[in-house]
From Swiss-Prot:
It comes from Aeromonas salmonicida (strain A449). The lineage of its organism: Bacteria, Pseudomonadati, Pseudomonadota, Gammaproteobacteria, Aeromonadales. PANTHER family: DNA REPAIR PROTEIN RADC, UPF0758 PROTEIN YEES-RELATED. A motif (JAMM motif) lies at residues 169-182. GO terms for biological process: proteolysis. This is UPF0758 protein ASA_4229. GO terms for molecular function: metal ion binding; metallopeptidase activity. Residues 95-220 form the MPN domain. CDD domains: MPN_DUF2466 (cd08071).
Length: 220
């Protein structure tokens, strides 16, 4: 049965317009994006199949072009459409902050960084009002003491005349709990930036839907 044959109050698009996007399941949201299903599968059924195949909505949205296009019911056109939607979301968040909004909310910071991060150690540079100056992706791959150089972070902070920074990196495993190496590297960066009077406001470790804040744990 196609979605058009469903009762109106069960159709994803009508449900979104009536109740808002937060009320929809991942499969229903994805179905609105896909618009149509394939032979034998409605858009919602196809969405459920894709979510099961990729493991989660996050994994599907973060899939590379090859993996995405190889999936049944997807292809280059859908991949291009998805990348455009994701980029618009990133730019919307960036514009909210870069218009001068202060980073006073930990959740706002997390939303901004979660939209940016792809297995990377990043630096958010802030002015003395905690407004965003620049978002810089620094190091890629596994975070360890050999890959992160406090001196380089100091140079970048000075170059942009930052008054404060927020550090962030994600754990590809999806587990957000900081490792001993995470804490040791943070301490080194904290000490290096303290010498030039630049504050580290937070270090965010981002996992699969969970973010750990060093500041909230009292580690800074």
């Amino acid at each position: 049965m196609s979605i058009k044959e469903w009762p109106e109050d069960e159709r994803p698009r009508e449900k979104l317009l009536r109740q808002g996007p937060a009320t929809l399941s991942d499969a229903e949201l994805l179905a609105i994006f896909l618009r149509t299903g394939v032979n034998g599968l409605s858009a919602v059924d196809l969405s459920r199949q894709l979510l099961q195949q990729f493991g989660s909505l996050r994994a599907l949205l973060g899939a590379d072009q090859g993996a995405f296009c190889h999936a049944h019911g997807l292809g280059p056109a859908k991949y291009a459409q998805l990348q455009a939607v994701l980029e618009m979301g990133k730019r919307h968040l960036a514009e909210q902050l870069q218009r001068g909004d202060a980073l006073t909310s930990p959740q706002l910071t997390r939303d901004y960084l979660q939209a940016q991060l792809r297995e990377v150690f990043a630096l958010l540079l802030l002015d003395n009002q905690h407004r965003v100056i620049q978002f810089v992706e620094l190091f890629y791959g596994t975070l360890d003491s050999a890959s992160v150089w406090p001196r380089e972070i100091v140079q970048i902070a000075l170059k942009h005349n930052a008054a404060a920074v927020i550090l962030a990196h994600n754990h590809p495993s999806g587990v957000a709990e900081p490792s001993r190496a995470d804490r040791q590297i943070t301490d080194r960066i904290l000490a290096a930036l303290a010498l030039i009077d630049i504050r580290v406001l937070d270090h965010l470790v981002i996992g699969d839907g969970i973010t750990v804040s060093f500041a909230e744990r009292g580690w800074l």
